[in-house]
């Protein structure tokens, strides 16, 4: 199930105010899609809207917290009333959390899981039924992470949330096939990407030192790919119908290493962690 021509398609991107979400919104707009953008920080959408408008595109913007089921449903009701079912839903909104498991407060787990997992669940429950009922080729893209496949130390909450997104995507994809739906499902697993998610010090456990955080941020800045690389991969997956997309530095090698030897993968992850002072 692929969608070669995106002109006039209605595409919703969550977390569109920055990073991968912003780049994805601009990438789809360049393909001629009508964009529906939402973000917890409504003001962050203004420059994205302006960039799309200045390039001759069209979009609507909405301040929405994806953790709030009722708010996501209100957005869906508005979107459906305005133009019917979406053609593409990109569940991108997410947050990172850095910290050893024993140093991470339970509240940090709740925030991470509510945003990264329940945010996707709310998006699916609010938009997928109409997409399925409308018929025609449509697609859901869930943005997970390489961390859901090859977890690193001090990322237990984030890794667990992204692993859940991968499992959720796989299971729902099979259900869609069982009912012969024309809605396809793609899960995107970015590797090292240099975005603001790594620079948000609010999402860092008390046990992480300033030096450790600085080393990690320097590593992401030096080795991380640009968000636009992920955005192009998302657009490409919608056009080709790919179900799993690994993108960015280290994503494919670590994915295949995990399949070959989990023991060797763990050794590699420990070596990298020690290089950044996490020991």
What role is predicted for each listed range?
Residues 124, 161:
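Active-site helix of classical SDR
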Residues 177-245, 249:
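SDR active-site lid
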Residues 100-101, 105-110:
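Substrate-binding pocket helix/loop in short-chain dehydrogenase/reductase
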Residues 10, 17-18:
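Conserved glycine-rich cofactor-binding loop
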Residues 33-47:
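Conserved glycine-rich Rossmann-like NAD(P)H-binding loop of the short-chain dehydrogenase/reductase
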Residues 42-43, 63-74, 106:
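The beta1-alpha1 cofactor-binding region of Rossmann-like NAD(H)/NADP(H)-dependent oxidoreductases
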Residues 145:
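Residue(s) in the substrate-gating loop at a strand-loop-helix junction
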